[in-house]
Each structure stands twice: as C-alpha cells, then as structure tokens.
C-alpha cells in the first residue's frame, strides 16, 4: 500500500491538474501534510517554485504588518477557506487555487525604456515565475482588502476571492488588477 500525504490531511494534490502549461513548472503540488517548510528554499534564487503552492499563498497572506509572522493563524485561515470552497463548489480547493493563479496572473506588462532622456512605455511578455508571484500577490491583496474593517473573516474573503478568480469574475480584485495591467500593456504596444 502506497501512502500519499494530503494537504491538511484532507485534499489530495495528485488529483490537481495545471491546465496552463506556461506555469506548470512553477506551481509545486508536492504532497505535504502541513505546508510549512521553514524557509529552507530561501537561500537560492528561484527555489521558491519548489515550495508547495498552498504555503506560498499562506506566506503572501502574511504581508500586512498585523499578520507578519503569524503562520499558524494564516494556515488555519487557509484551511478554513479550503473547507468553504469545498462546500460551495464540491471541488478540490487546490484545483480552484491553481485555476485562480492561472487566471489572475498577467500575461503582459509594461516596462519603461529611456530614449534620449524620454521614458517610453513598452509592452513585454511576463515570465511564468513572475505570473505566479503576481497572481498570488493580487489574491492576497484582495483578501486583505476585503477583510479589513469587515465582519467577514479572512477565510471567507479568501474563499470568495479564489472562487471569483477561478471563474474569471471581474468583481474579483485579482482579476480586476490583472485586466488593468494588461489594458495598460495593450495601450503601450
């Protein structure tokens, strides 16, 4: 009998399919019970893609000054959000997370080039690693903004944000930010 670890002891990451081939290499679905690696991948530049995607989401949620360092609280909120997602959609919440990341990551961005003292915006394709990082940042920013001075818990706000991003709902903060960034890039072509 082969025993595979499930994330939080409930959800099997081996059932999850990354449909966006561009980010497949950068979304780690390694089976772990508790997504907490203690930062062992922080020494090398691109090793963050080896960390479980659930842990990277939790790390991004700890960005605000009130949540800094409270990883157990954040992991509990992520687990509760996954329970809410499972109740609402009847799907594996890790699949919803992966779909949300694929939908919320901008494909095109703007860089500023200097030509003789004049800065000119130019549209460029976004690297897959940066797409994943930006999508996680937008999802966590949307969650924190929705939960700030609200009666709703962080878990409820995270579940709403992930479901909205997975369904490409424009009311979702992350999809809205992605569309705005791509709109600026389209104008700079």
From Swiss-Prot:
HAMAP family assigned to the protein according to its UniProt record, in alphabetical order: Ribosomal_uS7_A (MF_00480_A)
Family: Belongs to the universal ribosomal protein uS7 family.
Keywords: Ribonucleoprotein, Ribosomal protein, RNA-binding, rRNA-binding
Gene Ontology BP terms: translation
GO MF annotations in UniProt: rRNA binding; structural constituent of ribosome
Protein known as: Small ribosomal subunit protein uS7
Gene: rps7
InterPro entries: Ribosomal_uS7, Ribosomal_uS7_arc, Ribosomal_uS7_dom, Ribosomal_uS7_dom_sf, Ribosomal_uS7_euk/arc
Functional summary from the UniProt entry: One of the primary rRNA binding proteins, it binds directly to 16S rRNA where it nucleates assembly of the head domain of the 30S subunit. Is located at the subunit interface close to the decoding center.
PANTHER family for this protein: RIBOSOMAL PROTEIN S7
UniProt-listed CDD domains: uS7_Eukaryote
A Pfam family: Ribosomal_S7
């Amino acid at each position: 009998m082969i025993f595979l670890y499930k994330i939080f002891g409930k959800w099997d990451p081996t059932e999850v399919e990354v449909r966006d081939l561009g980010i497949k290499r950068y979304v780690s679905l390694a089976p772990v019970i508790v997504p907490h690696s203690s930062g062992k991948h922080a020494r090398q530049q691109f090793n963050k893609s080896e960390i479980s995607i659930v842990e990277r989401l939790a790390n991004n949620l700890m960005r605000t000054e009130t949540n800094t360092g409270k990883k157990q609280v954040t992991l509990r909120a992520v687990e509760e959000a996954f329970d809410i997602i499972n109740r609402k959609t009847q799907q594996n919440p890790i699949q919803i997370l992966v779909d949300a990341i694929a939908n919320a990551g901008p494909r095109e961005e703007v860089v500023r080039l200097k030509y003789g003292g004049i800065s000119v915006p130019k549209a460029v394709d976004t690297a897959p690693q940066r797409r994943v990082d930006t999508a996680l940042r937008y999802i966590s920013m949307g969650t924190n903004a929705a939960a700030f001075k609200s009666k709703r818990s962080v878990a409820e706000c995270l579940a709403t944000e992930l479901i909205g991003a997975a369904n490409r709902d424009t009311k979702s903060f992350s999809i809205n930010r992605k569309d705005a960034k791509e709109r600026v890039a389209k104008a700079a072509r």
